[in-house]
Amino acid sequence: MVDDSAVVRQVLVNVLNDAADIEVIATAADPLLAIEKMRKQWPDVIVLDVEMPRMDGITFLRKIMSERPTPVVICSTLTEKGARVTMDALAAGAVAVVTKPRLGLKQFLTESADELVATVRSAARANVKRLAARVTAVPLEAEVKHTADVILPAQSGRALAQTTERIVAIGTSTGGTQALEEVLTALPRVCPGIVIVQHMPEKFTAAFAARLNGLCQIAVKEAANNDRVMPGRALIAPGGKHLLLRRSGAQYFVEVLEGPPVNRHRPSVDVLFRSAARAAGSNALGIIMTGMGDDGAAGLLEMRQAGARTVAQDEQTSIVFGMPKEAIKRGGADRILPLGAMAREIVTQLQ
C-alpha cells in the first residue's frame, strides 16, 4: 500500500485486511520506501497513489513493470488532474483504478469498500506477463446483484432490420484500458460506429476517451445522451451511468441513464449488449474482452440469439480471462479471437 496520506493508508489497510483472503504485508508513504520494503517481501498486488513526494507514482510504476512486472491498482482522486494522471498510469501498465477515500469516510466504507476488495482480488489474477509485453509494445461493485432486467426488461423475438447501418458493441473490465487502446488505434477512419462499456469510476472515462481520441484515427468521446452512433466514431459509457443503444428510423443513438448497478457494475456490459440485441439485431457485432466476473456474458448470448456476430477474446491475450470465459461457457461467442485480430474483425463488419 503506497500512499503519502497516513489516513488513506489506514482506511484502505483496514478495508483490505477485513477480507479473509487478503493480507496487507506493508505500507509506505512514498515509492522509495516502498521499494526497500518490497525487496524484503514482494507483494502479489500493489495499491498505488500517483501523486507522491520523492518519486511520482508513474515513474515507480514504469520501474516495476520493466524490472519485475506486478499487478498494480491505482488509487486516485476524483479530480480532472487525477483522472489525467490515472490514464497515464493505466497506459504504463496498471491493471485497474479505484477512487481514493475522501472526507466522507463513512460513505466510502459504505459505497466503495467492496469495490476495492473485488478490484484487488481481480488484480491478483491478472496476466502480468501479457500486460508487461503490451506496455512495451505500446509507448507511452453493490451487495445486491441485479440483472439487466432492472434497466431494460427482456423481450422475445429478433430486432427488425430497418437499416443496413452496422454497429459494434464492446464490453471490457480489468485490463480493458490497454486492450481498447490496442484495438482502437489499429482501426482505420472508415469503420462502423462503436459503443463501449469499460468498467471505470465516474470522471475517469472523460479523460480516458480524450486520451484515446488523441491516439486514434477514429474519433473517440465520452458518450452523452442522444449522441448519434456514427461510422468512424467510438462512444465510451460515462462512469457511474448505464449506456443503451437505441434506434430511430435508420439511425442509432445512445441513451445515458441512471439506475442501480447491474452485475455490481454501472455502467454494465449486459445492459449495453441487451440494448444492442434489441436495437440492432443482425446488424451488430458484439465483442467481450478481458475482465473479471460475468458482466456481459448473458448479454452477449442475447446478441447472438438476436442474429448478431459475437466474439470473445482468447485466454492467452486476456489480462483477466473471466468475462470472456463466462461468455464462451454460456454459448454467447460464435468466435474466439486474440486481441490482435479484433480490429480486423470490426472492419469486416462493414462488409
From Swiss-Prot:
Report the EC code(s) recorded for this entry.
Answer: 3.1.1.61, 3.5.1.44
Residue numbers annotated as active site: 173, 199, 295
| InterPro entries listed in its UniProt record | CheB-like (IPR008248), CheB_C (IPR035909), CheY-like_superfamily (IPR011006), Sig_transdc_resp-reg_Me-estase (IPR000673), Sig_transdc_resp-reg_receiver (IPR001789)
Highest taxon of the lineage: Bacteria
Residue ranges constituting the Response regulatory domain according to the UniProt record: 1-115
User: Where is the PTM 4-aspartylphosphate found along the chain?
Assistant: 49
Cross-referenced SUPFAM superfamilies: CheY-like, Methylesterase CheB, C-terminal domain
Q: Which residues form the CheB-type methylesterase domain?
A: 161-351
Task: Tell me which GO cellular component terms the UniProt record holds.
Answer: cytoplasm
What post-translational events are described?
A: Phosphorylated by CheA. Phosphorylation of the N-terminal regulatory domain activates the methylesterase activity.
Alphabetical list of Gene3D superfamilies matching this protein:
3.40.50.2300, Methylesterase CheB, C-terminal domain
Q: Which GO terms describe its biological process?
A: chemotaxis
Per UniProt, subcellular location reads as: Cytoplasm
Q: Which SMART domains match?
A: REC (SM00448)
Similarity field? Belongs to the CheB family.
Its domain comment says: Contains a C-terminal catalytic domain, and an N-terminal region which modulates catalytic activity.
Q: What does this protein do?
A: Involved in chemotaxis. Part of a chemotaxis signal transduction system that modulates chemotaxis in response to various stimuli. Catalyzes the demethylation of specific methylglutamate residues introduced into the chemoreceptors (methyl-accepting chemotaxis proteins or MCP) by CheR. Also mediates the irreversible deamidation of specific glutamine residues to glutamic acid.
Task: List, alphabetically, the NCBIfam families matched.
Answer: PRK00742.1, PRK12555.1
State what protein this is by name: Protein-glutamate methylesterase/protein-glutamine glutaminase 1
